Amino acid sequence: MEPDWSSLESAARAALPRAYAPYSRFPVASAIQFADGAIVAGVNVENASYPLSLCAERAAVAAGVAGGHGPVRAVLVLTDAVEPTPPCGGCRQVLAEHGAPDVPVRAVTLQGRTAEHRLGALLPDAFRPASLDGRNPPPPRDVW
């Protein structure tokens, strides 16, 4: 399935005004296309206790998993930055748990600048369930 970049960007643009970023003043929206074709958006939600803040990409992954949509197939990240902003390291790790290394990740600015990478290029040698070497494997996923 080819990513529906137009719908992904529309979903992220619709979500961006709902970002809660009073501390960084750096709102971020993400839209993820899942294996079943569903597109789910997320926004960053900051907290006065900074480590408890939630990134837009992780919010979208969590909503997609809760909705039973299956593996990640494409990711779009939208900001009002001058340069396209790819996912942070923590989000890259979460995306690697739910998507394959060939998943396209597109960073877009409100002004239309874009950068695109494959998830595996953003996080080579990701820590994955197989990294546990068979100890404590995750339970089977009936949904996927």
Segments predicted by a language model, with ranges:
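Alpha-helix C-terminal capping segments
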Residues: 62-69
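Stable alpha-helical structural segments in soluble proteins, enriched in small hydrophobic residues
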Residues: 12-15, 56, 60
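Structural signal for short hydrophobic segments within the conserved structured cores
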Residues: 40-43, 115
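Short beta-strand scaffold segments in enzyme catalytic cores
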Residues: 27-34
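Active-site segments that bind and position negatively charged phosphate/pyrophosphate groups
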Residues: 24
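Compact, glycine-rich, soluble single-domain proteins
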Residues: 44-58
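C-terminal binding/interaction regions
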Residues: 2-21, 69-144
